[in-house]
Amino acid sequence: MPQRHTTSELFLVLVASLCCLVVGARADSAKGPSASQARKALTRIKQLELKSSAVRVKSVTSTGASTADVATDLRLVFKFQTGAEGRWGVSEVRTGQDRWEGIDLIAEALHANIAADCNAPDPPLKGKLAVDPSVRRARCLLGSLFGIDVPSDSVRIQEVDPMPVPLASQPSATVVAWIRVDARMTNAQGGWEVTEIRTGNRDWIRLDSVTAALDDQKRRRAREELDLIATALEKFRSERGFYVVADKQAVAIDYLSPRYLQRVIRVDPWHQPYGYLGERDRFTLRSSGPDGKPDTTDDILVSSR
């Protein structure tokens, strides 16, 4: 005859099964994200649009039931440029399709010193065509930027592509490099997400605080650029007797540059076109601010005097 179980025995079996499920779930959570989950989280960093092919997860270390540290190599693209003294420096990093962020803005937001002495003469090459900047110089500059002592596998140069631009005042180049980045992740309701990052001997930095600090610097930069355009419009009016009449900032810039405005300024630090509405006796200049939407509370406005 089949063995019969009492109600109490069945209850104990059920409780034991549930306990096993809970323990198993906690054990899986304690393992941290898988490599694919970590890669997905890194590609979701809103400040830096990365493809999966640009992320190589090296290791995952669980630091708690819902936290983990991930070591990864990221393929990043930089613009290098020479300064007034002919010294090479890192000027921009690509943060998305046709979108670049100025290194100076990032450094100001993080209160970081990006000065680097990487301009010693390169040794002569044998059997190879020299490129400028050299791989050695590019590695030195990026190592200094990220707090990494070079030579190191934490900075590996994939490509140096000089960019000859006709009539350009300063030589420039595009550099593709793999940079070792430590990422701190948290398992939130929507899945694993990156909350902090660190490179080389730098301290951990929170991504949300970086975004806020960077937006503050961009507001300051936008205000400075709008003031420059406004000053140019006042000069235009003092000579012509009226402001530029237009509803597009690009039209106003075409009238102002180069006689009244030496720099051609068309987009704000958030990569959105500046707004302009001008009549003969008044004008309004506008940046849509961090949200990129006009007529919201974060707009930056400069009007005629």
Question: Predicted regions span which residues?
Answer:
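Short beta-strand element of the conserved SAM-dependent methyltransferase core
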Residues: 60, 78-81, 185, 276
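Surface-exposed, charged secondary-structure patches
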Residues: 28-29, 40-77, 93-109, 133-180
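Bacterial N-terminal signal peptides that target proteins for export
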Residues: 2-12
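Soluble periplasmic/extracytoplasmic beta-strand elements of cell-envelope proteins
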Residues: 71, 79, 89-91, 284-286
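N-terminal trafficking/processing presequences and adjacent post-cleavage segments
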Residues: 24-43, 98-144, 210-241
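Bacterial N-terminal signal peptides
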Residues: 12-21
